[in-house]
Amino acid sequence: MITLAVDAMGGDQGLAVTVPGATAFLQAHPDVRLIMTGDETQLRQALTAAGAPMERIDICHTTQVVGMDESPQSALKNKKDSSMRVAINQVKEGKAQAAVSAGNTGALMATARFVLKTIPGIERPAIAKFLPSDTDHVTLALDLGANVDCTPEQLAQFAVIGSELVHALHPQKGQPRVGLVNVGTEDIKGTDTVKQTYKLLQNSKLNFIGNIESNGILYGEADVVVADGFVGNVMLKTIEGAVKFMSGAIRREFQSNLFNKLAAVAALPALKGLKNKLDPRKFNGAILLGLRGIVIKSHGGTDETGFRYALEEAYHEAKSAGLSKIEQGVAEQLAALETAKAVQNENADGL
């Protein structure tokens, strides 16, 4: 039995989204129990109204909620009994294999890092997410917004934890291909930080394939793509915006005249397949990667379907136990990175 902790009060709409999303998820997974944290009276009423299977839900009463615009410092200092904090505590205490929250990203990252700590050798956690491609291939992208300013060493650490996670989840595919997001594929391009990161990764034991431009990510050119949080977040929001634009443009075009409406009827199966493939809700649920525990961040503005998919992500991560398998591999890869850094420094001193 898999047990997931759910911050029921987090997100833009709170219980209106988390409860129906959790109910649909439980109906699809009889092997799951949920610990839902939040106001017990409100939670029980919402769960009963949704027809949730109460025999597989434990309610953990909390008295506080972290606001969507609340600072991480305030959440850490003043919201120790928040639904977010208590959900993460369930993972720390071994009562749940993963926690899911649609709450304030900064507060969630700060709280999770404080409660769970990071994997030894990893300075900062990163927001990581699996992105679709034009095939059945998926690519893990990180960092998507947690750390807007990174050192080369931190970017290299992101590459390590991303590579180790993908390898743990798909060992049959061999060593994951790691790409560094840049403005061009040539190693002379990019900021000084990116150039130094390139050299570190080039001399590491990772399967580093070099720089990758953002327009190649959705074509499955790499299994792991690494960027700082500023670049990664802009990249992610651009992809999401492009998908929404394309979906809307196709819909408007087919509705523009009678002939196109008739054509839409004939193309309906293909359109449904395309809509299903591009539905951003299916890829809701980002991993706070680098922590000693599984925490999944749902988009704060998602609907019940999107929240269900965030729970699906937590379920698959917990069931695969991928994160529990990576610490040894991370330690070995970080040791190789230190060697690469030492060689790089020696070469620089010799110039």
Swiss-Prot record:
Enzyme class, spelled out: transferase
Localization annotation: Cytoplasm
Primary site of residence: cytoplasm
Function comment: Catalyzes the reversible formation of acyl-phosphate (acyl-PO(4)) from acyl-[acyl-carrier-protein] (acyl-ACP). This enzyme utilizes acyl-ACP as fatty acyl donor, but not acyl-CoA.
Record field: catalytic activity: a fatty acyl-[ACP] + phosphate = an acyl phosphate + holo-[ACP]
GO biological process: fatty acid biosynthetic process; phospholipid biosynthetic process
Subunit organization: Homodimer. Probably interacts with PlsY.
Record organism: Neisseria meningitidis serogroup C / serotype 2a (strain ATCC 700532 / DSM 15464 / FAM18)
A cellular-component GO term for this protein: cytoplasm
Keyword Lipid biosynthesis: yes
GO MF: phosphate:acyl-[acyl carrier protein] acyltransferase activity
Protein name per Swiss-Prot or TrEMBL: Phosphate acyltransferase
EC number: 2.3.1.274
Pfam families the record matches: FA_synthesis (PF02504)
